[in-house]
Amino acid sequence: MGKIIGIDLGTTNSCVSVVENNAPKVVENAEGARTTPSIIAYVEDGEVLVGAPAKRQSVTNPKNTIYAVKRLMGRKFTDPEVQKDIGLMPYAIIQADNGDAWVEARDKKMAPQQVSAEILRKMKKTAEDYLGEEVTEAVITVPAYFNDSQRQATKDAGRIAGLDVKRIINEPTAAALAFGLDKQDKVDRKIAVYDLGGGTFDVSIIEIANVDGEKQFEVLSTNGDTFLGGEDFDQRIIDWIIAEFKKEQGVDLSKDVLALQRLKDAAEKAKIELSSAQQTEINLPYVTADAGGPKHLNLKLTRAKLESLVEELINRTAGPCLTAIKDAGVSVANIDDVILVGGQTRMPAVQDKVKEIFGKEPRKDVNPDEAVAVGAAIQGSVLSGDRKDVLLLDVTPLSLGIETLGGVMTKMIPKNTTIPTKHSQVYSTAEDNQPAVTIKCFQGEREMAAANKLLGEFNLEGIAPAQRGMPQIEVTFDIDANGILHVTAKDKNTGKENKITIKANSGLTEEEIQRMVKDAEANAAEDKKALELVTARNTADALAHSTKKALEEHGASLEATEKEAIEAALKDLDEAIKGSDKEAIDTKTEALGKASQKLGEKVMAAEQAKAGAAPGGAAPGTASDADVVDADFKEVDDKK
């Protein structure tokens, strides 16, 4: 059985970890970095760039460079959060046929799952390069406050990337695993995980207990906001830069897509710098131009100003924290440790707010960028059977229920219920001889069903004719360990289990997933072909170069026919290298190798003659006595 890797699929950055010899290790990507920007670029020649290469070209290709796509996962186009992003993103967010939010690049319409799959493929490849074996299974993390649609979308992204997603786990829970596993003390402790990432905010209260030699991680409560993160902090800085520049220069940069991409990069850099400095300079020469010529941007941003710009965002994290504490049935005094997760928690003002909420300094011994991936890898080792001393008890973040008379949300499974869990409820008909019932399933905390997230409509058909209220229809809600809902129904009067039809109101159909899997496989095959072509070209190029050099130095000692044959083979190979036919390049490389065999022999003979040429010379690698210098040495004691 191969390794089950752990992947933190982040809004801004992603990370992959594996467990080796019982210890988790974060794997560096091909660029040598431990985290990979969650950025995907679709370039003109059809190539797809992922991570740092995509980020580097984003300024010149903003409309086809997709970032923060996690914010669109499992969302409808009409969602207020999506509508807000449409005005901010340089790329096109469009409405799919099923009403979902999709993106468009190079005239191709794509689901967020497809785009996320490109990041997952890079994470998969990173792990494979390190392990030296194929990876097919993974544990992928999601924000604790992700709903059913968003979790299902993440699983689908994994499938498109060629991964069997063994488990979806919540990011704060994964961070708690990373934090608590190496703690040797036997004392039970309650921890709060404050996770402010690139696009989402989560808080979980978790109890770590030692039960019969086993570490038990039990989530007591969770809360959050799936549309609050570092990207929003960046946007506040961008809005401020645009307003300041308009005041100074009278030019509105918000209409300039190329300028906006530069502003985004500058805002992110300024925010990071202000975590350690009190002031930073935002300097963008030639940011735009008008009739009067080019315009340059030069602004000073202080830490105090930044804090005033984002104060409202930081304050928004307090509500979910207080709710989570209340739902967990604990007081702030009961919480032993506060752990910070997510890059945005490096901001001093965020750390001050955490201290204010929980009444204690947050711990700094957890890497906020890597802890989630490490925890996912640990859970992977538990699922593969490599670790048997860890038990994870997670919860469902939002209540599940159905719409009943008057449009009321009747909760069947309340939020913060430990999963997996199952709940059954008996329903009946509202009219005589009613042949079918439609059960609308919702997820959320609002009293009226319509204000919550509609997960789907469950139709039960073929009910035997009877008076209203007589048929007994048992509906069972079953949440698996991934936090994903499954529904079954049974007509209790007949004892038959009737198959329920789930009319998913969003998400990808099985056909769409299969098509995207095939597309991804085709891309992988294309990538392999491209790599093979580059390798063949490099081999051919190296042979052509060395042959030309040898011909210049030793060509005079060849027969005229031999020299002509080599020159003809060189010409053929040069032509083949310009093309894209790998077979032709390989054939011509082989032909040149054969044609230049005699030349190779001449070169070898010349080298050997040169090596033995110097009479009375010292043998290679030895020195004559004349070169040796006698020296006295004295030992020096550094400690004096």
Curated annotation (Swiss-Prot):
The keyword Chaperone applies. Residues 608-628 are annotated as: Disordered. PROSITE patterns: HSP70_1 (PS00297), HSP70_2 (PS00329), HSP70_3 (PS01036). Belongs to the heat shock protein 70 family. InterPro entries: ATPase_NBD, Chaperone_DnaK, Heat_shock_70_CS, HSP70_C_sf, HSP70_peptide-bd_sf, Hsp_70_fam. This is Chaperone protein DnaK. The modification Phosphothreonine is found at T200. Induction: By stress conditions e.g. heat shock. Acts as a chaperone. It holds the Pfam family HSP70. It comes from Polynucleobacter necessarius subsp. necessarius (strain STIR1). Keywords: ATP-binding, Chaperone, Nucleotide-binding, Phosphoprotein, Stress response. One of its GO terms (molecular function) is unfolded protein binding. The keyword Mitochondrion does not apply. SUPFAM superfamilies: Actin-like ATPase domain, Heat shock protein 70kD (HSP70), C-terminal subdomain, Heat shock protein 70kD (HSP70), peptide-binding domain.
